[in-house]
Amino acid sequence: MRAVMALSGGMDSTALLMRLLAEGYQVSCLSYNYGQKHSIELERASANLSYLSKNEYIIDHRIADLSSAMGIFHSALTTDGFDVPEGHYEQEQMKQTVVPNRNAIFASILYGYALSVAIREETEVVIALGVHSGDHAIYPDCRPEFYKAIEHAFNIGNWDSNMVSFHLPYIAGDKESILRDAIISCERLNLDFDTVFRNTNTSYSPDSMGRSSGRTGADVERILAFHAIGRKDPIEYVDDWDIVLERALTIEKEH
């Protein structure tokens, strides 16, 4: 079985990679430098791929540099002087973290890559993405209807499109269910869950040492997910775990 996926270095795509490997897929990963303000996610992705390699899971990984084009897009994630908002991940101000048309661009490149692999290797290929229900409120390009429409358009616009299809296993789930799935995958692969997720970044505003602030919407969602499964997040935060957890729980209660 063959898969092509987007690996951001975040929690969701990392869990997806574990799932695909546990299911027996041969996986090729694309990461994107889209002009984001920090490269911590890409560094963490590389660290995880090195860990996988040491455990004899070899992943074909490429980084697509889109920074010259997407770096001029207006978003709190790409625009200097535009601060990343803090608070609950479904609050209105979190729309400031939307990068215009980002997932359409990413999906288009992935589709072309997957179709090329399918033709070259004469096999069917799935395009795997870690989008989930927690993103639906703020990010319209993470919703099921978006991927249904864009897959339809890509199918119309390409020969041999019957050889590729989108695979969105988390589309109806949330970060808690993603972590629970990852626990199972890591056990099947004989990998250490904490090591895998220590090599991830979810924060939109990590400090210069790569530590997560614990204050952005993405941080809060991640912290609450780890709390829900009864585990301490293995990444390093600017504040102690008890402090960031208490803050996240307060934000959740107030929301």
Give the positions of each predicted feature.
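ATP-dependent adenylation/nucleotidyltransferase module used to activate substrates
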Residues: 1-193, 219
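Immediate flanking context of iron-sulfur cluster ligation sites
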Residues: 191-214
